[in-house]
Design a protein with these regions (language model features):
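A short, N-terminal "cap"/entry segment at the start of jelly-roll beta-barrel domains
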Residues: 1-55, 99-101, 145-156
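Short acidic-glycine-tyrosine-enriched beta hairpin
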Residues: 63, 94-113
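Short beta-strand His + acidic residue motifs that chelate non-heme Fe in jelly-roll/DSBH
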Residues: 71, 89-90, 98, 110, ...
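Glycine- and acidic-residue-biased ligand/ion/polar-headgroup-sensing regions
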Residues: 74-95, 104
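Ligand-binding loop in jelly-roll beta-barrel domains
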Residues: 103, 112-139
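C-terminal partner/receptor-binding element of secreted or periplasmic proteins
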Residues: 128, 133-156
Length: 156
């Protein structure tokens, strides 16, 4: 599929701190909250459903200016909150390799199996808090080679 050697891109200038890892059996949690009691039709809803034993990881990452997570994917979904700084991420399946910017106080969802890179292109530390679900015993991160459509991103 690839001509020549394909190298994964490693994280640079990233300091991870694991807060907790917990193991869960099948999860089937659903909640629905009426947010407009007068209308009774306006609901907020959440659903978490897993089949099989899962590991839940909660961690904080501090990424110095110019730092990068390198190209990678995850075997399960992650919820990412940008605590401070600005996260700039790129998706391998985006033909234009356009940056997506997430400011402090906002977040994004990584559905899992999406090859991407998150970088700190700002001038202050980027701090993220991440909650990841992965199959029990699996590594949370899978290193990936830099995609051909993102040549302007040296080292991911």
């Amino acid at each position: 599929m690839y001509a020549g050697t394909v190298l994964a891109t490693a994280p640079r200038r990233v300091t991870p701190t694991t807060f907790a890892v917990g193991r869960f059996a099948d999860i089937d949690a659903t909640t629905k909250t009426d947010i407009d009691s007068g209308a009774r039709t306006d609901f907020w809803q959440a659903r978490i459903n897993t089949k099989g034993v899962s590991d839940l990881h909660v961690l904080q990452n501090t990424i110095a200016p110019g730092g990068t997570f390198g190209w990678h994917s995850h075997p399960g979904p992650s919820l990412v909150i940008v605590k401070s700084g600005t996260a700039t991420f790129y998706m391998a399946d985006d033909p234009t390799c356009s940056p997506q910017v997430v400011q402090a106080g906002s977040g994004f969802v990584d559905n899992g199996h999406d090859e991407h890179v998150v970088r700190n292109e700002g001038s202050v530390d980027l701090v993220t808090v991440v909650v990841s679900f992965v199959p029990a015993g699996f590594a949370r991160r899978i290193d990936e080679p830099a995609p051909a459509n993102c040549p302007a991103l040296p080292n991911g």
